[in-house]
C-alpha cells in the first residue's frame, strides 16, 4: 500500500485534538513510514502575509493585488516552527519534492520570496509543522478505523473552503461523513 498523494480523512470517532475532523495530505509514504500535512486546520491569527512580515520577506516585484491574507495551516504536531509549502509544480526552488503531477512540497525560503509576485506557484498552501508515522504505524491506524483513505484532489487542497475540506474529501469516496457512526465495529 502506497498512500503518497492520498488524503487521510479522520473518522468521526478520532478524538485527538490535532486530528479530529482533519484531512491529511500524504506527501511521502514508503517502507520506513509516512509524512503528511494537515490541510484543514488554520492557525488563528496567522496569515501568509504575517509570516512574510515576520521573516522580513518583501520582494521588490510584489503585486499588491495578490491576496496574501490566506490562513496558514497547522500541518501537524512535529516541527511546528518549520514551514512546509504545498504548491502546484514550479521548478527552481532549492528544497522541493514533486509529489504528483499536480503538487510539490517545498521547505526552502526561496519559495516564500516568490509569494505575492509573478514568480510564485499558481496555487499555494502554507503550513507550519507536519505529521509522521513510523513504519507500519499508519497502516495499523487505518486497520483500527481511525482513517479513511482516498486519492487526493488538488482542488480540495488549494480551492475548497477550509471548513468544507473534511466533508469534501469524504465525498470523493461517495459518502456523507456526517452519516458515519462515531464507533465502528468489525464483522
UniProtKB/Swiss-Prot annotation:
Pfam families: DUF179. One of its GO terms (cellular component) is cytosol. InterPro entries: AlgH-like (IPR003774). Signal peptide: none annotated. SUPFAM superfamilies: VC0467-like. It comes from the Bacteria. Belongs to the UPF0301 (AlgH) family. This is UPF0301 protein plu1183. It comes from Photorhabdus laumondii subsp. laumondii (strain DSM 15139 / CIP 105565 / TT01) (Photorhabdus luminescens subsp. laumondii).
Amino acid at each position: 500500500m502506497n498512500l503518497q498523494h492520498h488524503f487521510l480523512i479522520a473518522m468521526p470517532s478520532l478524538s485527538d485534538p490535532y486530528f479530529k475532523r482533519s484531512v491529511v495530505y500524504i506527501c511521502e509514504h514508503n517502507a520506513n513510514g509516512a509524512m503528511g500535512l494537515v490541510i484543514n486546520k488554520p492557525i488563528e491569527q496567522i496569515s501568509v502575509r504575517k509570516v512574510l512580515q515576520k521573516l522580513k520577506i518583501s520582494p521588490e516585484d510584489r503585486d499588491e493585488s495578490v491576496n496574501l491574507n490566506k490562513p496558514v495551516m497547522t500541518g501537524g504536531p512535529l516541527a511546528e516552527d518549520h514551514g512546509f509549502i504545498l504548491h502546484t509544480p514550479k521548478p527552481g526552488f532549492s528544497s522541493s519534492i514533486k509529489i504528483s503531477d499536480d503538487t510539490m512540497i517545498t521547505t526552502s525560503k526561496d519559495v516564500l520570496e516568490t509569494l505575492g509576485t509573478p514568480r510564485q506557484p499558481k496555487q499555494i498552501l502554507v503550513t507550519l509543522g507536519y505529521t509522521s508515522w513510523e513504519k507500519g504505524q499508519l497502516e495499523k491506524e487505518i486497520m483500527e478505523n481511525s482513517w479513511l483513505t482516498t486519492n487526493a484532489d488538488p482542488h480540495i487542497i488549494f480551492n475548497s473552503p477550509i471548513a468544507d475540506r473534511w466533508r469534501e474529501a469524504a465525498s470523493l469516496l461517495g459518502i456523507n461523513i456526517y452519516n458515519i457512526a462515531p464507533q465502528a465495529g468489525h464483522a
